[in-house]
Design a protein with these regions (language model features):
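Active-site and donor-binding regions of nucleotide-sugar-utilizing enzymes
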Residues: 20-21, 25-145
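A donor-sugar binding/catalytic signature common to diverse glycosyltransferases
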Residues: 24-25, 242-283
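Short, charged/polar "capping" segments at the starts of alpha-helices
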Residues: 26-29, 53-55, 117-118, 181-182, ...
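Short internal beta-strands
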Residues: 45-47, 126, 206-212, 276
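A nucleotide-sugar donor-handling region in carbohydrate enzymes
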Residues: 118-185, 299-308, 318
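Conserved catalytic-core segment of nucleotide-activated headgroup transferases in glycan assembly
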Residues: 178-210
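Catalytic donor nucleotide-activated moiety binding site of glycosyltransferases and closely related
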Residues: 203-238
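Leloir-type glycosyltransferase catalytic cores
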Residues: 288, 292-340
């Protein structure tokens, strides 16, 4: 899709109005917010929830007529945004409809493979482990998120008292959970428990947080393995201390199912161990690339010491934001195939 709005070259992107279009999955909004935060834009979040056959057959169908797309008073109505960013298959019918209604007025961006072709948006981002490529496709090694260098630096300026009281080294354990492509067999849980117990034997403290996808059996494994050591284990009440855990951990352990959490861990510049069960081909390519880059290492069944290594922190959001800004100001310009 070629954009030809002549007004953009003279308009600051900082004055652009943005829409974020996602379903109700937190991980989708995390990626969109990371990019729009890097652009320093105000935005309106448009959460979509197609029903029935439209949910089943997304991303290929149009929004339902009952949603009155484009009509005054509906959730999707003029004035159209300058920039729209969509993530997830349920959002694709809406970004495609927006392109038809707004035309060159709106610069459209899709994060992740839309499955509906390169013409879906003006710009498409996919992680390197996705094989989609094209003139309007850019890639980065990790996924975008909101933990920028500035945000992490700000978090590190003031350490919460309960974290400061923990002896170092502080090991963060970031728990994901099963997905359609990723399952935890009992043997995997047992192996994870042994690995964490070997870490506990090295006398660190722990910062443990599950996610919304984390099943009780996975949380229990981390609970049992770390309870002999000083720790903070977030049980779901109140605000998740995850941002402070990221900022103040000396070493991080993350389950391989979560590309978002692994990407966030690799923004810290701290050693990241990844616990892997059976991986899909995409996940395997992602984690292999991170190991080759030097950000992560596989969590072994047993550790005799906590290894230390360094790498340049990975931040995808500002790279994607820079490409959006360049493309938005220079309609029709070519895009590099990679921002890594």
């Amino acid at each position: 899709m070629t954009c030809s709005n002549p007004d953009r070259a003279s308009k600051s992107i900082l004055r652009a109005r943005a829409w974020l279009i996602t379903d109700n999955k937190v991980g989708m909004l995390v990626q969109c917010r990371g990019v729009v935060d890097a652009l320093h834009l105000d935005y309106v979040h448009k959460q979509v929830d197609p029903k029935g056959v439209r949910r089943l057959l997304s991303p290929w169908l149009h929004p339902a007529k009952s949603e009155h797309f484009g009509e005054i008073g509906s959730a999707f109505a003029p004035p159209w945004p300058d920039i729209a960013i969509a993530t997830g298959r349920l959002s694709i019918p809406y970004i495609r409809a927006l392109s038809r209604w707004a035309g060159a007025r709106t610069f459209t961006v899709v994060l992740q493979n839309p499955r509906t072709g390169l013409g879906t948006a003006d710009l498409i981002w996919v992680p390197e482990h996705d094989l989609l490529r094209g003139q309007n496709v850019i890639t980065t090694l990790t996924a975008p998120h909101s933990f920028s260098q500035d945000r992490l630096a700000e978090l590190r300026k003031a350490i919460p008292a309960e974290i400061a009281a923990l002896p170092r080294p502080r090991v963060a354990i970031l728990l994901g959970g099963p997905t359609r492509a990723y399952r935890y067999a009992k043997a995997d849980l047992d192996r994870f428990g042994r690995a964490l117990a070997s870490v506990a034997a090295l006398n660190p403290s722990f910062l443990v947080t599950p996610s919304r996808r984390t099943p009780m059996e996975l949380t229990n494994v981390a609970d049992v393995a770390t309870r002999s050591r000083p720790r903070l284990l977030w049980a779901g009440g109140g605000e998740n201390p995850y941002p402070s855990f990221l900022a103040h951990a000396d070493v991080l352990i993350v389950t391989a199912d979560s590309i978002n959490m692994t990407s966030e861990a690799c923004a810290t510049g701290r050693p990241v161990y990844v616990f892997e069960a059976k991986l899909s081909n995409k996940h395997a390519r992602f984690h292999l690339a991170l190991r080759r880059y030097g950000a992560t290492r596989s969590l072994p069944d047993g550790l005799s010491h906590l290894e230390q290594w360094t790498y340049t922190p990975l931040h995808a959001a500002p790279q994607i934001a820079a490409e959006i800004a360049r493309r938005w100001r220079q309609p029709g310009s070519g895009l590099p195939l990679s921002c890594s």
